């Protein structure tokens, strides 16, 4: 059985936006959200699933002994010399079975920016020159946050960028967070 770190690395190689660790009667299902689609990754024993959740909660400074109340946490995981931010959310059901969801937040430089076709990006560049609000909508993993940060980075250093995102998903040294 691979270590928990090796398990995370195997998942990160697939570039998911999220990992879902969900309990079933006799096992835990690990599923990855990739480009807005939830794909089964692996079924593990209940014991392994609970230990994996405990390990992740420990890394994120969450209360490992709390299995019922919702909790939030975060930690950084190093993969291929890059620090990836992991944002965790756990909750238990009425049977005391715990679920955990992880959002993987990749460094902006490492994100493959292929969400838009060229004419869409050019149009956004034109809108960026004007004043007003640009609204982004779409499913999870569609590239909304990445697109906004790519646009905001182009404003530096001539303009100040203040982010109001909570929690901040992508940090940048030039932004006021």
Model-predicted regions and their roles:
Residues 140-141:
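Walker A (P-loop) phosphate-binding loop of P-loop NTPases
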Residues 154-155:
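Residues immediately C-terminal to the Walker A/P-loop in P-loop NTPase nucleotide-binding domains
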């Amino acid at each position: 059985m691979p270590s928990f770190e090796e398990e995370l690395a195997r998942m990160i190689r697939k570039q998911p936006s999220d990992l879902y660790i969900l309990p079933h009667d006799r096992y835990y299902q690990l599923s990855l959200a990739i480009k807005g689609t939830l794909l089964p990754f692996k079924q593990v024993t209940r014991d392994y699933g609970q230990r994996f959740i405990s390990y992740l909660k420990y890394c994120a400074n969450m209360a490992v002994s709390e299995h019922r109340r919702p909790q939030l946490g975060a930690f950084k995981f190093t993969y291929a010399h890059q620090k990836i931010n992991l944002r965790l959310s756990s909750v238990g059901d009425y049977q005391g079975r715990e679920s955990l969801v992880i959002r993987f937040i990749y460094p902006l430089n490492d994100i493959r920016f292929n969400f838009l076709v060229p004419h869409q990006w050019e149009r956004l560049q034109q809108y960026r020159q004007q004043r007003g609000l640009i609204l982004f909508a779409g499913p999870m993993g569609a590239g909304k946050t990445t697109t906004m940060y790519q646009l905001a980075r182009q404003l530096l250093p001539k303009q100040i960028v203040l982010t109001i995102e909570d929690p901040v998903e992508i940090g940048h040294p030039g932004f006021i967070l």
